[in-house]
Swiss-Prot record:
Belongs to the class-I aminoacyl-tRNA synthetase family. ValS type 1 subfamily. Pfam families: Anticodon_1 (PF08264), tRNA-synt_1 (PF00133), Val_tRNA-synt_C (PF10458). PROSITE patterns: AA_TRNA_LIGASE_I (PS00178). It catalyses: tRNA(Val) + L-valine + ATP = L-valyl-tRNA(Val) + AMP + diphosphate. Catalyzes the attachment of valine to tRNA(Val). As ValRS can inadvertently accommodate and process structurally similar amino acids such as threonine, to avoid such errors, it has a 'posttransfer' editing activity that hydrolyzes mischarged Thr-tRNA(Val) in a tRNA-dependent manner. ATP binds at K524. GO terms for molecular function: aminoacyl-tRNA deacylase activity; ATP binding; valine-tRNA ligase activity. ValRS has two distinct active sites: one for aminoacylation and one for editing. The misactivated threonine is translocated from the active site to the editing site. This is Valine--tRNA ligase.
Amino acid sequence: MEIGTRYDPKNIEMKWYKHWLEKKYFTPRGAGPKYSIVIPPPNITGKIHMGHALNITIQDILSRYKRMKGFDVLWLPGEDHAGIATQTAVERYLSTQGKSRRDFSRDEFLNIVWNWANKYRQEIKNQIMSIGASVDWTRERFTLDEGLSKAVRKVFVDMYKKGLIYKGKYIVNWCHRCGTVLSDEEVDYHEEEGALYHIKYPIKGEDDYIIIATTRPETMLGDTAVAVHPSDERYRKYVGKIAILPLVGREIPVIADNYVDPSFGTGALKVTPAHDTNDYLIGQRHNLPFVDIFDENIVINENGGKFKGMTAEQARKAVVEELEAQGYLVKIEKMKHSVGRCYRCDTVVEPRLMDQWFVSMKPLAKRAIEAVENGEVTFIPDRWKKVYLNWMYEIRDWCISRQLWWGHRIPVWQCQDCGHYNVSENEPVKCEKCGSTNLKQDEDVLDTWFSSALWPFSTMGWPEKTPDLERYYPTDVLVTGFDIIFFWVARMIMMGYEFMDEKPFKEVYIHQLVRDKYGRKMSKSLGNGIDPLEVIDEYGADPMRFTLAILAAQGRDLKLDVRFFDTYKKFANKIWNATRFVLMNLEDFEKVDIKLSKLKLSDKWILSRLQKTIQKISEALDSYDFNIAANEIYNFFWDELCDWYIEAVKNRLKTEERKVVQNVLVYVLDMSLRLLHPFMPFLTEELWTKLPTSGESIVVAQWPEIEENFIDENSEKRFMQLMNIIRGIRNIRAEVNVPQSTKVKTFVKGTLTDEEQEYIKFLGNVESIEFVEKRPELSATAYISLENEVYVSLGTLIDVKSEVERLRKKVEKLKSDMEKFAKKLEDENFLKNAPEDIVEETKEKQRLFQEQIARIEQIISDLEAKA
């Protein structure tokens, strides 16, 4: 059966995906050993990015591999409602229409968001399909669907009853742009240019003052103390005295607290308990009053006196000017300091004292810590275990309420008569305490990550005891990025143990961060993002998948250059053309068992190499070394199958050995396409179904098993020697400018079988092979080993004198070019500071130069020798 002359992914990809869905290949059978994964649900805020593409590719490689290994695979898909991100996106859209959320009732606004959600859920689904994800769409879930909403309500109520959820007034992170509280993990901290302001605080009743230093002079309006370290001799005399707050006149105590760092600034700290987390803790320890100076828009409120109505930035400028005018400002120092910004909109986050709902995390963390410490849950690579544990040891309570409309509304109804909180899975009719029907539901919604934390079991039907939950929970692996270890991974582990009494997954594979070719993080501001959908459109899904897999080395960020996609599109073309060549030579094919007695050296070699490749790829996939697995099949298919075996047997296809060669080709190609399938599903399905030995679909074909009788170390060694001899002959041709079409004469000191000589003549374009006792004059060394020495005669092909002169100049040029790499490798700063892959790349370039120089110098030596 023939195929088209060129590989066109657009003609085959969606055709096969629709076929797979129709055949229900991605729906688990319910029999055999189980293997389950839940997809990290992408946000419904737009298009997927290259990080998603990598994540999906890795999960699909695992799913397809396990499916072919006979596992009952469930890869469960879904999407996340993404509270802040989605509401922000919708509000941004409304602003282009001249409207805001406040122009609508809550229900009207939620209708708009649901329409948005349904549209983008379908778009994201189509995008995931275009990558080739073998997820079971019949089990697709959404973090706001009714089943998950039921699970969320039950978890909230159960945790409240256990005392794990409580409401309290605490310092929280407030984003005034998003109009909501953020968890600690949703705040990104950056070093930014700022200033340290030194300000005099007069001591009451004395002609003295204490100088404090602060980066936020505007918050002094809410100061309720000055703190110093108890062992700081400079300030011991002030402890217990009263300071007068400049501009405000408030009397505030000078206190001693161990939190204060005597080496920072002046060693005296202004304490603003309502607007700083650490100050809040100091305030609690010393029973200080809490003065809140900001409203929800971070505008100064009535507690700010004459500065009321100013933004934080305006107030800072005005306060500093007033301090200077009244003689309180001592000096201003430039400095860098850490500034917290909203992870969604990059707005500066303001610590505020607010009533919020919290989860008590310490009780939940205990088992989740033990699970990772004892290996019940493992991280790959292992270094992420330490990152996880360090965070868990220091875990703080989680603020779960958000001042949004889009999300899971908190299932709490406060009685408007007695104030009691009625916490219920369903809307209560009356207050459980006083019987009043005057109830009002909490306006806030839950943090998006609250519902996401339940994802592994809520998606399988919990709290009902469903067959899916019984069979597929716990899942086998979670594939995710390091940036959500705290947001999501840790919380899933805690919730899994709390509500399922079982881990949610056995392994956590932390994949690479996708960066640009220079190692920079992809971002809109840099304009260096690569759109996976554009890549698929130009190169095809399979080349993109293979590129991501072959670059996915454990422990390293993935540096992506668009040229890589072209490289692996060429690989796809190579696979296509090799299959086409085989199919064109199968018109009289008859399947027979491959008998070792009828095989030639090249047959034995390729069959043995195939078994080694099967073993290495299987081991690599089992250990999540996707780059190693991809490299193995790439090298085997292109270098060994195409460049050597197919070239070696072309003549034999015209002889009585045709049937043997056909069967070896079909077997090796069949197994190779199966090995390639997890990486390049569309291409392999298109080609595999054309083979005379194919079955129903490569999706459900058996993963190749090692045929021990085909492993032949001796044949591998012998054929490797032939390859090195032929490479040596080709290298000499290249170095002395002898065209590949010109036949050369060779001399051999040693022994070669007739079969080996035929390979050398055919693949090396050799006219004759003469056996000699010593190296002839005017010949170049192609190969030397303990068994054989091979030389190429150059006497009639070149002018020796001019060739030696040319080669010497070439050596000088190569040495000059190599020098820049040598200098880099001698530079301690380069070796210490350059990324590891850049250092290795430099070493490799130097090695290649050294090899080429050594080859040419050997040819020069051979040409100059007289015997």
